[in-house]
A protein has these predicted regions:
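Short, exposed beta-strand/loop patches in secreted or surface proteins that constitute
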Residues: 98-101, 108, 136-137
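Extracytoplasmic cell-surface/polysaccharide-interacting catalytic and binding patches
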Residues: 2-67, 75, 120-310
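Well-ordered beta-strand positions in beta-sheet-rich domains
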Residues: 73, 98, 106, 123-125
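Solvent-exposed, conformationally flexible loop/turn segments
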Residues: 77-80
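Extracellular/lumenal glycan-associated surfaces
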Residues: 88, 114-122
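Glycine-centered loop/turn positions within well-structured domains
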Residues: 97, 115, 285
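Extracellular/luminal low-complexity segments enriched in Ser/Thr/Pro
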Residues: 105-115
Length: 310
């Protein structure tokens, strides 16, 4: 009899363990169901809020016109044109070997450099940028540009670059001294991982809608190893003290807010207060102090050339 009781106790013990494991599995699956859709919905914010700035274009980015920034800064690529506003007087370039301007205010980039263009009342600082195609991607004046017009090669796999990691650590330490908590929510993603993310969005929302808030594989800045998403990837982050501090101080450590508010039609993406890109201190300060996007600073476009064929 004692042997039978021991066997029953063992069976009861096994049943209890099995029941506990089953409960844990159900709980884990429930958490997964709650967490994964939430992450998808917040990866680029609410997709219904995005502008369709990334709709396909047929003209090459280098041939498209740029418009002058309200701060009196204008960047244009070599061999491309940009448009200044109507002038009361005639336009003049301080260095026609760098940039030329006609009577209508159309600026043509001649060669890499800087000059001033004025109508006698308003001065514009003109930067003519040089594009260089390297194996991994495209550089404008030595800055790696990745957006809807300029992809990276699929095999480019730098990981989170040390200069980015070190700069963010300094930024995070400085924020901590102010009682704030800034940490890495997401950083480097390789091409294959971006395929999964983009396909998930396409399955949920369709490719046209996905293009308005998610980068296609090869077109994601996260593949550069120069980009970090801070804290939670959620619109609510923009209302936090950390987000305010980040916008005010990120340039001191070489970062810019990559997709600033109100510039959706230029960057192709909704405002992302958590998304920062390392460009170096001097460049970051110039961009942030003038309220520019990286596209405006480099004189490039951000538009897909056609539908996704992946």
């Amino acid at each position: 009899m004692s042997g039978n009781r021991q066997q029953r106790r063992k069976r009861q013990k096994y049943f209890r363990i099995a029941a506990l494991l089953l409960c844990l599995a159900v709980l884990a699956f429930s958490v997964w169901l709650l967490f994964i859709p939430n992450q998808l919905n917040h990866r680029k914010g609410n997709p219904t809020l995005h502008n369709n700035a990334g709709t396909a274009g047929t003209e090459s980015a280098a041939g498209m016109e740029q418009n002058a920034d309200a701060q009196g800064f204008l960047a244009v690529l070599e061999g491309s044109t940009a448009q200044l506003p109507a002038a009361d007087g005639s336009w003049n370039s301080s260095d026609t070997s760098v940039a030329e301007v006609d009577s209508s205010g159309t600026v043509t980039g001649v060669q890499q450099g800087r000059c001033q263009i004025t109508d006698g009342k308003t001065n514009y600082q003109i930067a003519v940028r040089h594009l260089e195609q390297r194996q991994e991607g495209t550089y404008a004046d030595g800055i790696l540009i990745v957006n809807k017009s300029y992809p990276l090669s699929a095999d480019y796999d730098p990981g989170l670059q040390p200069i980015t990691k070190d700069a963010f650590q300094k930024l995070s330490d400085a924020a901590a001294q102010e009682g704030l908590d800034l940490y890495i929510g997401s950083d480097y993603r390789d091409y294959a991982y971006q395929v999964k993310i983009y396909n998930n969005y396409c399955n949920l929302y369709g490719s046209e809608q996905a293009d308005s808030f998610s980068a296609r594989p090869g077109y994601s800045e996260h593949q550069t190893g120069l980009t970090i998403d801070c804290n939670t990837i959620d619109d609510a982050f923009g209302e936090t003290a950390e987000a305010v501090w980040l916008a005010e101080h990120c340039a001191d450590y070489g970062f810019i807010i990559r997709f600033p508010d109100g510039k959706e039609n230029i960057t192709g993406y909704q405002y992302e207060p958590w998304h920062i890109r390392y460009v170096g201190v001097d460049t970051a300060k110039e961009i942030m102090s003038q309220g520019l996007t990286l596209e405006e600073y480099l004189g490039v476009q951000s538009e897909y050339a056609g539908p996704w064929e992946g």
